[in-house]
Amino acid sequence: QQRGLNIVQADIEGGLNLFGDAAFDLVILSQTLQATRHTEALVNEVLRVGKSAIVTLPNFGHWSVRWQLGVGGRMPVSKRLPYQWYDTPNVHFSTIRDFDVFCAEKGITVERRAVLAGGREISLLPNVRGETAVFQIRR
């Protein structure tokens, strides 16, 4: 703890049962969700222990991913996705729109969504142009 900020680092797939309801003001899942096995259960637990959460995820709907897969016929490799299909930690490949729909179907409120391309926020064609999405969510 420094300056009133508590940070906990743990195996998130091991469960968050050590923490009570609303134990944290904010839980951050940075580039994590796509690498977990039980996505829905994890999001439920994160929103149980946190009053809100920030989730960042890569956009597998980005035009370059579509191009590499559609034209090149291979799973994409890039600076943001530097792994081959056989050694990637990612087990879920989703788009920004997929996460929007997931939240709507599960009764999760998206308080704010920012879509980034080249480090800048964009609004035009976010599911095609966005490289990364940042969602602030709550129940």
Descriptions of predicted regions:
Residues 25-39, 57:
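A short SAM/SAH-binding and catalytic strip from SAM-dependent methyltransferases
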Residues 3-19:
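Conserved SAM-binding strand-loop segment of SAM-dependent methyltransferases
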Residues 7, 27, 52-53:
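Short, well-ordered beta-strand core segments
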Residues 40-45, 52-139:
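S-adenosyl-L-methionine-dependent methyltransferase catalytic module, highlighting the catalytic core
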Residues 14, 23-26, 42:
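Structured catalytic core of nucleotide-sugar glycosyltransferases
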Residues 19-20, 46:
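Structural alpha-helical scaffold elements that stabilize or flank donor/cofactor-binding regions
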Residues 14, 34, 62:
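Active-site micro-motifs of SAM-dependent methyltransferase domains
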Residues 22-23, 49:
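Alpha-helix C-terminal capping/helix-to-coil transition sites in glycosyltransferase folds
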